């Protein structure tokens, strides 16, 4: 069923491009150089080989990396890092192809849950198939396709933001019920201010650099925090024991400290 749906989406977009009529395309451009450089640093920190045939990796090459880390402690971190590396898919009135699906033509013509772009496309294609000529289609739907694309992209971004906030609230609510408990987690993010640690259950919390050492830390390319005085390091992908010390449900934020027995 999924293959039929993908094919229907592809055929609808191809039909519109060939007919040169206004349309709402689903566009996914390739990742830019800056994001790829960050991904490279992450993969190197996790000990993953990322030598690609060209400057921009193919989706097949990225899938091979994900398969290679499946079942390892780095699986979730690499998966998240790769998602953050990707360009945001959006709706546009001009066909630019879909990097992730490796397709020249793609649109959201059908889906398990009906979306507005689907309905916008149905409206335009129905008009064309009912006998409306190309010139009339251009006059009637050029502005409509542009506005529908822009609004659909904006609403999608907002929906994702709300979804993530809701998840953060529930994770903080869960963490609040387990204050003082110790867990093993994986370092999922490194900043000058401290490190982010993700637990196996998906809860992510922040460990301030000030709680790691009193002598100051040095950040290395966003992948490693080190204490020059003691020689200790905290790198992406490292495991560590933490204690849940704070959980703010309203902000959806959780704070950790290094577990006493591991300081």
Indicate residue ranges for each PLM-predicted region:
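Hydrophobic transmembrane signal anchors and adjacent membrane-proximal interface regions, especially
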Residues: 139, 223-225, 250
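Short nucleic-acid-contacting surface segments enriched for D/E, G, S/T with interspersed K/R
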Residues: 176-182, 216-242
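OB-fold/S1-family single-stranded nucleic acid-binding modules
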Residues: 199, 236-263
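Append "with occasional cross-activation on large, charged helical scaffolds in nucleic-acid assemblies
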Residues: 1-200, 206-213, 217-219, 246, ...
């Amino acid at each position: 069923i999924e293959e039929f749906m993908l094919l229907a989406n592809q055929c609808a977009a191809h039909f519109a491009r060939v007919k040169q009529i206004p349309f709402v395309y689903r566009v996914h451009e390739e990742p830019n150089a800056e994001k790829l450089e960050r991904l490279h640093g992450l993969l190197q920190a996790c000990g993953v080989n990322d030598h690609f045939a060209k400057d921009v990796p193919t989706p097949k090459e990225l899938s091979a990396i994900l398969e290679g880390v499946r079942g390892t402690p780095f699986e979730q971190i690499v998966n998240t890092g790769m998602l953050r590396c990707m360009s945001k898919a959006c709706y546009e009135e001009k066909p630019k192809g879909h990097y992730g699906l490796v397709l020249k033509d793609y649109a959201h013509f059908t889906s398990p849950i009906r979306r507005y772009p689907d309905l916008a496309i149905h409206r335009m294609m129905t008009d064309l198939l009912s006998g409306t000529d190309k010139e009339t289609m251009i006059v009637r739907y050029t502005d409509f396709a542009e506005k529908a694309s822009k609004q659909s992209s904006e609403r999608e971004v907002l929906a994702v933001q709300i979804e993530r906030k809701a998840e953060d609230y529930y994770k903080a609510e869960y963490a609040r019920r387990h204050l003082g408990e110790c867990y093993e987690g994986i370092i999922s993010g490194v900043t000058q201010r401290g490190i982010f640690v993700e637990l196996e259950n998906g809860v992510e919390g922040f460990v301030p650099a000030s709680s790691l050492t009193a002598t100051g830390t040095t950040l290395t390319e966003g992948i490693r925090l080190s204490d020059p005085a003691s020689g200790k390091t905290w790198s992406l992908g490292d495991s560590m024991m933490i204690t849940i010390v704070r959980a703010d449900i309203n902000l959806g934020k959780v704070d950790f400290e290094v577990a006493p027995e591991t300081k």
